[in-house]
Amino acid sequence: MKKLGIIIDSFTSITEDEFKKLEDFYFLPLQLILDGTSYEDNPSNDRQKLFDKIIQASDIKTSLPISSTIEKAVNESSQKYNDVLVLPIASFLSGTISVINVYAQKHKNVHIFDNHFVANTIVEIGLQAKKMYEQENKSIKEIITWLEEINTKTITFLSLKTLDYLVKGGRISGVKKFILTKLKLFPIIQSYTNNSIAGLKRTFKSSLEKIYNKLAEFIGGENNFKNYNLKLVHGPSKEMVDGAVEFFKQKGLEFSSIVLASTVIIAHTGPDSISISVVPKY
């Protein structure tokens, strides 16, 4: 039987126990750099300890997986499997995909799919691709076509409680930084073909209302939520998680998954942050 290998990275936010249950998956840890000290964002890390370090750090950076780790994963998987599917962090968020491509070009059976999936959605997509390839005898070309369709119909919005981490990362500067930090607004970030500001709200609840309306518009109306999985990815703020769950419950909706974000995500969004995605059911 033909076999499909999958390569993922720490943008999946996968835990150690979850990763141990996966077969034919390779993992690439992104790097977190706090005040000059580097940490690999591995599933085995104690995230809460690293969240605490992020809060205390004055200089926060992230970086690509180590090049030799990427090379080893690509080379080994290409020899072991008929085809290999790479589902990396989006190219508009990281240069990881460019480095992977350097090694993938040497192997015709390694296929990189640039996407804007978030967290456990990436793993679920990988598992479905394996099922289609190995059990349904789909070609890699058919799987890529399916991935393109799902990716196009998926969108994510983030609500952040503070702009401090965007400022530390150099993503806001000058007069704009001064105005936004003084107003204490909740920025809403849309993640699709890039990251862009989708709105600014004065309260967390109003940011959730804005996200709900944006999601409904994207899927063609409130009645279509039944055709999508609603997913929540969050930092260590229980208050924001509980608030989001209750808000969407009042709308008659439940999250199909609630996942604690990896440290490289929180390094950019801050601990008081959530992301909400719609992913079409399949």
From Swiss-Prot:
Pfam families for this protein: DegV
Role noted for this protein: May bind long-chain fatty acids, such as palmitate, and may play a role in lipid transport or fatty acid metabolism.
UniProt keyword terms in alphabetical order: Lipid-binding
SUPFAM superfamilies: DAK1/DegV-like
Domain (DegV): residue spans on this chain: 4-280
Keyword Transcription regulation set for record: no
Protein's UniProt keywords contain Ubl conjugation: no
Binding annotation for hexadecanoate: 63, 94
Name by which UniProt lists this protein: DegV domain-containing protein MYPU_7660
GO molecular function: lipid binding
